[in-house]
């Protein structure tokens, strides 16, 4: 093989090695991003659950207040 062919082969191998290294770094970045997104998703799920509980509690309190108001209005009607 001629020296030029060996140089071309070396250049191609170096390009392939560089490409592999870049792809490995990109894979690591994507893994980190995936982990961050999974953590964020878990936090959002917990927040949603908490908000659903608060909503349920507020609906129950609202219903209780409506019942109290109805009872008071009923008593006022009885007084008249």
Curated annotation (Swiss-Prot):
Gene Ontology biological-process annotations: division septum assembly; FtsZ-dependent cytokinesis
Coiled coil region boundaries: 3-80
Alphabetized UniProt keyword annotations: Cell cycle, Cell division, Coiled coil, Cytoplasm, Septation
Cysteines paired by S-S bonds: none
Cellular component, GO, one term: cytoplasm
Subcellular location: Cytoplasm
The protein's assembly and partners: Homodimer. The ends of the coiled-coil dimer bind to each other, forming polymers. Interacts with FtsZ.
Family, similarity comment: Belongs to the ZapB family.
Function: Non-essential, abundant cell division factor that is required for proper Z-ring formation. It is recruited early to the divisome by direct interaction with FtsZ, stimulating Z-ring assembly and thereby promoting cell division earlier in the cell cycle. Its recruitment to the Z-ring requires functional FtsA or ZipA.
Annotated protein name in UniProt: Cell division protein ZapB
Originating species: Vibrio atlanticus (strain LGP32)
């Amino acid at each position: 093989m001629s020296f030029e062919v060996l140089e071309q082969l070396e250049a191609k191998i170096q390009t392939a090695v560089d490409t592999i290294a870049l792809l490995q770094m990109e894979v690591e970045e994507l893994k980190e991003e995936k982990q961050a997104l999974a953590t964020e998703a878990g936090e959002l799920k917990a927040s949603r659950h908490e908000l659903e509980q608060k909503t349920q509690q507020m609906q129950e309190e609202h219903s209780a207040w409506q019942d109290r108001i109805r009872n008071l209005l009923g008593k006022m009607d009885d007084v008249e």
